[in-house]
Amino acid sequence: MSTSIRNRLPGTIEEIVSDKVVSEIVINTAAGPVTSIITTGSVKRMNLKKGDTAFAIIKATEVSVEAR
């Protein structure tokens, strides 16, 4: 995969919660868990499953912060 995005965190998919339109994916990385919302169609197209190795690719202008 070739991309200009520099913030790539390798990890393992811990959880996928899907509904009809969107899915929430949690990737465990060395920096901690990263949660992403993508379309359920993309999850199916990439054949993503719990336990798969994946990269969290983060564009600096697209980061949201949520207090816990």
Question: What is each stretch, according to the model?
Answer:
Residues 1-68:
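Non-catalytic connector elements of ABC transporters
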